[in-house]
Amino acid sequence: MEQIVKILSAKYVTHNVRQFRLEKPSGYSFIPGQATELSINIDGWQDEKRPFTFTCLNSDDYLEFTIKTYTDHDGVTNQLSKLNAGDEVIIRDVWGAIEYKGEGYFIAGGAGITPFLAILRQLNNDGAIGNNKLFFSNKTDKDIILADELKSMLGQNAHFTITNQKDSIYDQRRINADFLKAEIKDFSKHFYVCGPDAMVEDISGLLAELGADTESVVFER
């Protein structure tokens, strides 16, 4: 079901990632980690649907999306980068397979952090962060989405890796088999993986090879 909602606010949280807060229709609900298809309520764009993950809590009185904008071509995210409070977007039914199953390891690449933002915020709100660990890979330091909030929630368990900046203040290893073997002590825990398709496929395969139960590896299938 399609519903037209107004943008309440829009702000940049990195150089190319924008956080949108929208009106929340009465009765609209989701589980942290889930997504919806969104389009822009402008002629020619209403049917250009793209999936975006909620980054707010279900208990919030607004909907929030944290969206990486690609301005090098005239797609949906480029159009979204031009919108402001008062403009309208179209949201649809909720879907998604990324859902918290229990304590473990979150492995994210770039904008793949978004489903984990909602999950970690909910756990933090419930006082249930526990010993969950995050491995978050980006090209440069300035690409890290909401680094301060992630550090505040997870403390030493927020682990950032940078792949394309030699003077980074963070770990510069890639998340590969050697990294996983060095950093993960217990492959019987839950794993949550989100990022570019190739990364998700690669890491899911590596985790299985290293002894993770495939039923305990959560990603969008």
Report the location of each language-model feature.
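Absolute protein N-terminus
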Residues: 1-2, 221
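Ferredoxin-reductase
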Residues: 2-85, 139-140
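FNR/FR-type flavoprotein reductase catalytic core
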Residues: 72-221
